[in-house]
Amino acid sequence: MKEIFDRRYPVTSFFLLVTTLVFILMFLTSGFNYTSAATLYKFGAVYPPAIKAMPEQIWRLFSATFVHIGLEHFLVNMLSLYFLGRQMEQIFGSKQFFFIYLLSGMMGNLFVLVFSPNAITAGASTALYGMFASIVVLRYASRNPYLQQLGQSYLSLLVINLVGSILMPGISLAGHVGGAIGGALLAIVFPVRGERKIYRPGQRGIASLAFITLSALLLFIGLF
């Protein structure tokens, strides 16, 4: 437990803890029906018809990142978060990683709202794809050889996983693509440790505006 919730990586530890607690609560309150649509909805999964009917439920765009559909879904995503989250905190810093994770997840869920309007969807994958994409961007922007190599490695993983999202049933391609787009934009917005001048202020401003505009457009389309 001490190794998992490491104080050197407070944000990764926080997200692991919250997601684990949600998963345990789902099982304790619903038993082996914890993957039912009713339970997923109760704990905050994205369900576009509900958000459209009750716009005040846009909080689901954030909460769905902490809800998982089954043990395998939970374990795979938490293992990915455990390893990738630590790298993200080292590269971007804890504060920046906090926002990249949450906002990438939100962007992925906005894509679900628009492009999967009848599906009930949940999982940290939207945020994880954003993390992958944010490191891939550094492949082309950073002068650090380590970050360039890491970005190249994650580019291959990102492509493979996106292809898998297309071929495998029950996978939210919209959420994964949206999360990746969000993460790529946020990698420009938030500075990298030791390379704060990697982008000019104007470039950061354009990326910020693009993220906000895309989010607002998707929300408008999804609600109306």
Model region roles, listed by residue range:
Residues I4-R8, P49-E56, L147-L150:
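Helix-boundary and loop/linker segments of multi-pass membrane transporters
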Residues V11-A122, P169-I171:
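N-terminal TM1-TM2 helical hairpin plus the immediately adjacent luminal interfacial "cap"
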Residues F74-L81, A122-S134, S172-F190:
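Alpha-helical transmembrane segments that form the membrane-embedded catalytic/substrate-binding core
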Residues M88-G93, R143-L150, R193-G202:
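Membrane-interface helix-boundary motifs at transmembrane edges
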Residues T12-L17, F98-L102, L128, Y154-L155, ...:
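Hydrophobic alpha-helical transmembrane segments
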